[in-house]
Design a protein with these regions (language model features):
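Catalytic phosphate/metal-binding cores of nucleic-acid and nucleotide-processing enzymes, i.e., regions
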Residues: 1-154
Length: 154
C-alpha cells in the first residue's frame, strides 16, 4: 500500500540509543535542581514559534540568547552571584555537538561581567559536573528514567 500523498512523512520514534535533545537534557536536569531546593528558573526561549507568537513574546521582553537555566542561589564555591547554564546536546550518537549562537555568547559574557558564573553544558553529565564544581549539593544518584548522554562514535 502506498502512503497517502496528503500526509507528511511519519516521524520515527527515537530509539533509546539516539542522541538526547536539549529538551530531554533540561527535563532530566530540573529534577536535580528541584531536589537540591535551589532558587532557579528555566527560560522558555528555545523552540520554533510562528511569527505572531514570536512578535508577541518579543514585545513582552523575551530576549534572544538568554541561558536555559538561571540559578539565583549563589554558588557555595563563592564564585559568582548566581549560575547560568546554556544546555547543548553533546556530541555522539552520530550527531554533532550543539552550537552556541552569537546571542547566547553575548549573554554568557554579559552575565560574567556582572559577577555571574555562566557556562555551557554539553549534556546532562557535564551540567551536573558544572553544578557540583560550583559547590551545589546535588543528589547524584541517577533518577529513574535518566537519559544517557554519553556515547562514543568511535
Amino acid at each position: 500500500m502506498k502512503p497517502s500523498p496528503y500526509r507528511g512523512p511519519r516521524s520515527q520514534p527515537r530509539s533509546k540509543s539516539s542522541a538526547p535533545s536539549e529538551a530531554d537534557i533540561q527535563k532530566a536536569l530540573v529534577r536535580y535542581l528541584d531536589d537540591a531546593h535551589l532558587l532557579w528558573t528555566a527560560t522558555a526561549n528555545g523552540g520554533k514559534r510562528d511569527k505572531r507568537t514570536a512578535a508577541s513574546l518579543k514585545a513582552q521582553g523575551v530576549k534572544a540568547g538568554v541561558p536555559d537555566i538561571l540559578i539565583f542561589t549563589p554558588p557555595p564555591s563563592g564564585i559568582g552571584t548566581g549560575l547560568a547554564l546554556e544546555l547543548k546536546r553533546p556530541q555522539g550518537f552520530g550527531k554533532a555537538r550543539g552550537r552556541v549562537s552569537a546571542h547566547q555568547r553575548v549573554w554568557l559574557e554579559e552575565l560574567r561581567a556582572i559577577g555571574w558564573r555562566a557556562e555551557v553544558a554539553y549534556g546532562l553529565q557535564h551540567a551536573l559536573e558544572i553544578l557540583s564544581s560550583a559547590g551545589y549539593d546535588l543528589e547524584l544518584e541517577p533518577h529513574t528514567g535518566e537519559i544517557n548522554d554519553h556515547h562514543n562514535d568511535d
